Design a protein with these regions (language model features):
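HhH-family (HhH-GPD) DNA N-glycosylase catalytic core used in base-excision repair
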Residues: 1-248
Length: 248
């Protein structure tokens, strides 16, 4: 429960992300799952309505909690709700994400919005590959839940790490181009899937294992892409080809 809420708000400046997550968890209390199960908008929204994260407002968080509540009531956990729409035979997790977000947004959200707005903030929490979205935050959540090592929690057992798609942030986009892991220029599901496919050639069983390293090369400002002289400190110096971009 905490992982999903954290991933849902993982956009924007790191300090702002951490602050928003802390504020939401403070409202949810020491037992977040129990809070979600007993969540009542009329009773609890006074603590949530003041919360703002970028364009997300309190009512969007109320809607998110209603969706999570439905998952718990219908399936017992987010994992069971997710795998109900999964096809283990699918080559990657894309079809399962499509079903997951579609079913999630079928939740009755009248208590959050009254009449559902066309661009309701809750839709941002549940993007779909069919819309072209890279589904970065959902893929980040799945990485945390499915992979098991010193970085990720690995508390889900029904999904294979081999089927995960890399969370496509700005650092992965840049390095994916530089390392020729993708020929796409425009970020989206196709780029995320192609980068993952390239990484799968290195580790078919766990292609997303490289996400943390790729992301942090960029976060540590070690990548020389875009600098006049490059960077002598860049660990990828000599293997990247930033100018080779072929298709949209």
């Amino acid at each position: 429960m905490v992982g999903f809420c954290a991933a849902a708000l993982a956009f924007g400046r790191v300090a702002s992300v951490l602050q928003s997550i802390e504020l939401l968890l403070a409202v949810m209390g020491p037992r977040p799952a129990a809070f979600v199960r007993s969540f009542e908008p009329a009773r609890h929204r006074t603590g949530i309505d003041p919360l703002v994260h970028r364009w997300i407002r309190g009512r969007d968080l109320v809607a998110l909690l209603l969706v999570l509540q439905r998952m718990l009531r219908e399936s017992g956990s987010i994992e069971r709700f997710f795998i109900a729409g999964d096809d283990p035979g699918a080559s990657d997790i894309g079809p399962a994400l499509e079903a997951f977000s579609t079913r999630a947004l079928q939740t009755d959200l009248t208590a959050a919005y009254g009449r559902m707005p066309k661009r309701a903030g809750v839709c941002y929490f549940f993007p779909r590959p069919s819309g072209g979205s890279a589904c970065k935050r959902l893929n980040l959540f799945l990485r945390w839940m499915v992979r098991s090592d010193a970085i990720d929690l690995g508390v889900w057992t029904a999904v294979s790490p081999a089927r995960l798609i890399i969370p496509l942030d700005t650092h992965v986009i840049r390095l994916g181009r530089c390392l020729r892991l993708t020929r796409y220029i425009s970020p989206g599901w196709k780029m995320a899937a192609e980068i993952t496919g390239s990484l799968r050639a290195l580790d078919h069983a766990d292609p997303v294992r490289y996400d943390f390293s790729l992301c942090h090369v960029g976060m540590m400002n070690a990548c020389g892409f875009g600098r006049a002289q490059g960077s002598r400190q860049c660990p990828l110096r000599g293997v990247c080809r930033p100018k080779e971009r072929v298709r949209n």
